[in-house]
Amino acid sequence: LITIVSEPHTDLWQRTYYGFSNDNAPVLQMKTSNKFFSFTVKTSFNSSALFDQCGIAIYLDSDNWMKASIEYENEEYQRLGSVVTNNGYSDWATHDIPSSIKEMWYRLSRRGSDYYIETSPDGTTFHQMRTFHLDKGDGEISFGIYAASPVDHSFTAQFSEMEVGECKWQPWSAEDTGFKQTASKRLRVYTLHNSKKAVTAD
């Protein structure tokens, strides 16, 4: 069991939309050159202030990293989501869940420089959160756990049931679904008389 008490005014974010850069959230990490593995951890937390967050992270440098966590919003809902930062710009993908949820499992899987995040409310059934790529994530990486409080607040996060093992993200092929690759087709856009557009490929 690892306990982290977050420090006020800590966060990870780079530039996009808000314009600022925050790079001071504590991340407890381990290093690996293994290109095929999965990392699983359970988080428990008592967050109660705006943007309180804890979860998993890959931190390569200030401009290249990812995090997945629950960020507290208010007494009704919080945001389960992920941030991927490549070359100094962050994105943020979320969906709302009840604020009564105070535990979450995360599973991070790696295949080369591509990564896959899953979450689970019970540690048994995992659901896809995101598939993503890190531009500088093909070599040795540092990954682990973090907690942060962007506002003037602090909370306690606990991390347990940590496991690093074989990659649980199975490779996918077009034959699995009968999907045929059509990347070589050229896209053409025609402007119609009513200003609507029809799109065809040949």
Residue ranges with predicted function:
Residues L1-L187, H193-T200:
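Extracellular glycan-recognition regions
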